[in-house]
UniProtKB/Swiss-Prot annotation:
InterPro entries: AAA+_ATPase, ATPase_F1/V1/A1_a/bsu_nucl-bd, CSD, NA-bd_OB-fold, P-loop_NTPase, Rho-like_N, Rho_factor_ATP-bd, Rho_N_sf. ATP binds at G188, K189, G190, Q191, R192, A193, R200, T201, G202, K203, T204, E205, R231. Keywords: ATP-binding, Helicase, Hydrolase, Nucleotide-binding, RNA-binding, Transcription, Transcription regulation, Transcription termination. This is Transcription termination factor Rho. It comes from Helicobacter pylori (strain ATCC 700392 / 26695). Facilitates transcription termination by a mechanism that involves Rho binding to the nascent RNA, activation of Rho's RNA-dependent ATPase activity, and release of the mRNA from the DNA template. GO terms for biological process: DNA-templated transcription termination. Gene3D superfamilies: 1.10.720.10, Nucleic acid-binding proteins, P-loop containing nucleotide triphosphate hydrolases. Homohexamer. The homohexamer assembles into an open ring structure. Pfam families: ATP-synt_ab, Rho_N, Rho_RNA_bind. HAMAP family: Rho. Residues 70-145 form the Rho RNA-BD domain.
Length: 438
């Protein structure tokens, strides 16, 4: 479980909170097995060392209830096609398990719950013939009292606008990645950005730098990192490197699981935007997500080059297209990586389909990465639409003068020139003034 995932008790104050004694499910999930055994012995669970970890947590909570305690649980609602739902834990994978909490169709209708809602409530343990915990009483929805969200708008009815507030990525003088992006490919709240990345060009490190810049400069932004079809060690590294919430579906899981995780993360982000919040989703990668959709989409009989079904890209485009700045308040920013030069014709077709859908492109170059220059950022090819709204007239003029100078250089010379000058200055303002003097 990601330690930085928000919980009801630690991150938000809820007016309707009922005092609850004992241990909470989300707390037990973070404890090492040794501590769980210690708690079990304290509660006088019989033979605790014979239980598997998940079963031991179950026994602790069941014993706690029989001794007069309550269970308070915070989870993300996943609504099934039959109308009922489950609260999934913040373990980063929304995996099915006996610790999930059942939510009845009547509760979903009564409180107008939606997919991706973060629900906090009192939970009872399973009875003899039941497999799951059951939600008894809802305390809060999306960290707010339930009566406050009854009139919340629907995400699809909100008005999209061009991004008009820049997300500052510059956070340390020596970390030039964020500084370069702030000038040459600025990211605003509500941006739909594509990181175009050949293999081994440092896209994972770039994602970490983006996450660090966002969390350092914008504490009001809720950061979500979504890793699809990634290696397990990459997931662990990301969880330990960034402060945002990391959700993942690793390459050893089926395509259906990739899609389920991605869609639940998107629904969760939409629910927060409906509440007027600013949310940033870093997706690695849109290519692998599109591959997963292609694997599960029934054949339409129309196959594009590379084996991509004509209908397979509609849903990943809908995912990417959800990014928008909202006129009524709030924003959803999606920064996704797109893989190129992998040797796969399918990946090239997917990239071509997504190339025109974003309003910002961050291009990484293999020839720059081969020179061991990081970030392998192709300044000349990268850019943001309507960047005049984000940068302002004065800064935009200076950036365009600098771009005109660099047009006479190749991509490696341009990056080396900017990199060396940024190393001599403490921030972008000083860098632009230095360039202006020349």
């Amino acid at each position: 479980m990601n330690e930085n995932a928000p919980t009801h008790k630690s991150s938000h104050k809820v007016k309707t909170h009922t005092p609850v004694s004992g241990y909470h499910i989300e707390d037990l999930r973070t404890y090492p097995t040794e501590k769980l055994l210690e708690i079990a012995n304290k509660l006088k669970v019989e033979n605790p060392q014979e239980f598997k970890r998940q079963d031991l947590m179950f026994e602790i909570l069941k014993t706690q209830v029989t001794q007069g305690g309550y269970i308070l649980f915070t989870g993300i609602l996943e609504i099934m096609p039959d109308g009922y739902g489950f609260l999934r834990g913040f373990d980063g994978s929304f995996s099915d398990g006996h610790n999930d909490t059942y939510v009845s169709p009547s509760q979903i209708r009564r409180f107008a719950l939606r997919n991706g809602d973060i629900v906090t409530g009192q939970v009872r343990s399973p009875k003899d013939q039941e497999k799951y915990y059951a939600l008894l009483k809802i305390e809060a929805i999306n960290y707010s009292p339930s009566d406050e969200i009854r009139n919340r708008p629907l995400f699809d009815n909100l008005t999209p606008l061009f991004p008009d507030e820049q997300i500052k990525l510059e956070y340390e003088p020596t970390k030039v990645t964020g500084r370069m992006l702030d000038l040459f490919s600025p990211v605003g709240k509500g941006q739909r950005a594509l990181i175009v990345a050949p293999p081994r060009t440092g896209k994972t490190e770039l994602m970490k730098e983006l996450a660090q810049g966002i969390t350092s400069n914008h504490p009001e932004v809720e950061l979500i990192i979504l890793l699809v079809d990634e290696r397990p060690e990459e997931v662990t590294d990301m969880q330990r490197s960034v402060k945002g919430q990391v959700f993942s579906s690793t390459f050893d899981l089926p395509a259906n699981n990739h899609i389920r995780i991605a869609e639940l993360v998107l629904e969760r982000a939409k629910r927060r935007v409906e509440m007027g919040k600013d949310v940033v989703v870093l997706l690695d990668s849109i290519t692998r997500l599109a591959r997963a959709y292609n694997a599960v989409t029934p054949s339409s009989g129309k196959v594009l080059s590379g084996g991509v079904d004509a209908n397979a890209l509609h849903r990943p485009k809908r995912f990417f297209g959800a990014a928008r700045n909202i006129e009524e308040g709030g924003s959803l920013t999606i920064i996704a990586t797109a893989l190129i030069e992998t040797g796969s014709r399918m990946d090239e077709v997917i990239f071509e389909e997504f190339k025109g859908t974003g309003n910002s492109e961050i291009v990484l170059a293999r020839n720059i990465a081969d020179r061991r220059i990081y970030p392998a950022f192709d300044i000349l090819k990268s850019g943001t639409r309507k960047d005049n709204i984000l940068l302002g007239k004065d800064r935009l003029t200076k950036v365009w003068v600098l771009r005109n100078v660099m047009q006479q250089m190749d991509d490696i010379e341009a990056l080396s020139f900017v990199y060396s000058k940024m190393q001599q200055t403490k921030d972008n303002e000083e860098f632009l003034n230095l360039m202006n003097e020349k």
